[in-house]
Amino acid sequence: MQAILDEFDEYLALQCGRSVHTRRAYLGDLRSLFAFLADRGSSLDALTLSVLRSWLAATAGAGAARTTLARRTSAVKAFTAWAVRRGLLAGDPAARLQVPKARRTLPAVLRQDQALRAMAAAESGAEQGDPLALRDRLIVELLYATGIRVSELCGLDVDDIDTGHRLVRVLGKGNKQRTVPFGQPAADALHAWLVDGRRALVTAESGHALLLGARGRRLDVRQARTAVHQTVAAVDGAPDMGPHGLRHSAATHLLEGGADLRVVQELLGHSSLATTQLYTHVAVARLRAVHERAHPRA
């Protein structure tokens, strides 16, 4: 089974352009399915729609969230379609399997004043010129300024940054490339990092990576999450959040400032406008909360 998983993983990476995070999740889902088959004394050849439904029912019975069920369904549908093309399955048992709709919840976002305080905290922490503090300042500034995903941030190379025009070239989901602008505060953080931070950490293993870990290798997602969590935690009253929370906040603040929905969609790299529209609900919900607190006849 491992050889099959390795080949499927290669297909997801090279032909589908799936991210490392998605591929890891899909392979974990398939290992769960294979273990379920083994417990029943079955093999891949015995995979049927009924078996898949039983597996998903067992997953739900174990307390899995609807988002997990939706992802597992997507994973197995992608796998069985590929397996049919590879001749590993005679027919596609998942063709009629419905992907459950994940219940959308409004993401936690920072208020604009909280976001500014978080950026100020990161800037203050970098005043002594510590390379890691300079890096962490750039992490939060770029994430909030551009709204890019943390995986996209960690994948950036130095050459992806156009400092003169304050633009960053991003390789997003499905290997789709987009260009996102950033403002002067992020440009200042970038300059400080390139001049005083990166040079102190760069090694032969650094390559062209923009952001580096303490040992000079390309920064990983886990380290970036830690930097964001610690920075936001310094802001009184701010919700606990990681990089995706800064992405949510950037999108919400753009819309609150009057940005066009389709422009925000392009900046975030959303393939569907419906995904971006979630942030309009966040903005409206925040306006309603302010109205209810402040208006005498709310």
Curated annotation (Swiss-Prot):
PANTHER family from the UniProt entry: PHAGE INTEGRASE-RELATED, TYROSINE RECOMBINASE XERC
Keyword check for Cell cycle: yes
Catalytic residues in the record: 149, 173, 244, 247, 270, 279
One biological process term in Gene Ontology: DNA recombination
Keywords in alphabetical order: Cell cycle, Cell division, Chromosome partition, Cytoplasm, DNA integration, DNA recombination, DNA-binding
SUPFAM superfamilies: DNA breaking-rejoining enzymes
Quaternary structure and interacting proteins, as annotated: Forms a cyclic heterotetrameric complex composed of two molecules of XerC and two molecules of XerD.
Main subcellular location: cytoplasm
Every Tyr recombinase domain range: 105-292
Protein name: Tyrosine recombinase XerC
Family (UniProt): Belongs to the 'phage' integrase family. XerC subfamily.
Purpose of the protein: Site-specific tyrosine recombinase, which acts by catalyzing the cutting and rejoining of the recombining DNA molecules. The XerC-XerD complex is essential to convert dimers of the bacterial chromosome into monomers to permit their segregation at cell division. It also contributes to the segregational stability of plasmids.
